[in-house]
Amino acid sequence: MAESIQSLDQLSQLKGAVTAPDAPKYEKKVDKFGRAYATGKRKDAVARVWIKPGSGKVTVNTRDIEVYFARPVLRMMIQQPLVAAARNGQYDVICTVAGGGLSGQAGAVRHGLSKALTNFEPELRGVLKKGGFLTRDSRVVERKKYGKAKARRSFQFSKR
């Protein structure tokens, strides 16, 4: 094999042809209603997300996204995976989210939406992975320590 390669051009052509036989092959996962499902997590929030082809309507806990997430920044955050994949307005999103605050819930919906998109269209996995949408944000609140006012803040010090 190594003897047959004479130049770098041949090597670059060979690179695309050779893939590992055990490389994971992602396939479309939809239920009997034609919906893709995924769960997303962020801080203390957990979101269950279903997507189906539609007009782009987003429903959170049976309420419209404009009602549930009043801040435009949170709505934009949820739409990011669809915009990155150039699928904005092509899917209806239904999700239930519980726990945490609004920012954590928006992050959980975004994470779940990204995973559901890859279940519906596995070819989008590379784009979403590159954008960092499929990675679980593991940052959580640091616990309070005894002998301290908060996690790191010490009590006020007095010399005398």
Swiss-Prot record:
Q: Which InterPro entries match?
A: Ribosomal_Su5_D2-typ_SF (IPR020568), Ribosomal_uS9 (IPR000754), Ribosomal_uS9_bac/plastid (IPR023035), Ribosomal_uS9_CS (IPR020574), Ribsml_uS5_D2-typ_fold_subgr (IPR014721)
The record's GO CC annotations read: cytosolic small ribosomal subunit
Any single Pfam family the record assigns to this protein: Ribosomal_S9
The protein's GO terms of the molecular function aspect are: RNA binding; structural constituent of ribosome
Gene Ontology biological-process annotations: translation
Domain of life from the UniProt record: Bacteria
Cystines in this chain: none
Q: Which Gene3D superfamilies match?
A: 3.30.230.10
Q: Keywords of this protein's UniProt record, alphabetized?
A: Ribonucleoprotein, Ribosomal protein
Please name the HAMAP family in this protein's record.
Ribosomal_uS9_B
Please give the family membership noted in the entry: Belongs to the universal ribosomal protein uS9 family.
Give the protein's recorded name. Small ribosomal subunit protein uS9
Give the organism, scientific name.
Answer: Bradyrhizobium sp. (strain BTAi1 / ATCC BAA-1182)
The protein's gene is named rpsI
